[in-house]
Amino acid sequence: MIDPDKTKEMADRFAGINGRFRIFLKKNADPKELDEHFHRLHNEIFYKYDYDCCKCNNCCNLYDIRMEPKDIAAVAGHLGITENDFIEKYLIPDKREFDCLIIKDKPCNFLDSNGKCRIYEYRPSVCRGFPYTNKPDRLYNMLSILDFMEECPVIFEIIEELKKIYNFV
């Protein structure tokens, strides 16, 4: 498994190849088969190799973390504050999406000094679902997957394995 600190460097090195791989998949891959490969590789990394995202935390340090209304309610309740106080203290509007709130600070306000999530049991749905490699319709999300590859070792490893599966060298 690639070192999380080297993921961006390696992804940048392969950016041109990965762009061509995305085009190759769009033209040649069966969407259902590609999803099956994604799901199998996802399961291998997380279950067979027992990968723990909490030891990386690149996503917590670098991404805009979106908060849905149900996430706001859960985290505010856990912290013992009102939703309005939570919004005022921790969130800002996302300039890219109308009516969406994101955590205002990077790294995420809820990481402790050891990089562990202080709200893990109540973490936002966007955090629960990341890296989305076990979701359907991966072919139609390849652009964002490749963007996330810069920071996520799991996505990096899956893309590298997919290149082998599709004989894209």
Language model features with spans:
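Short loop/turn segments that flank or connect secondary-structure elements
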Residues: 1-169
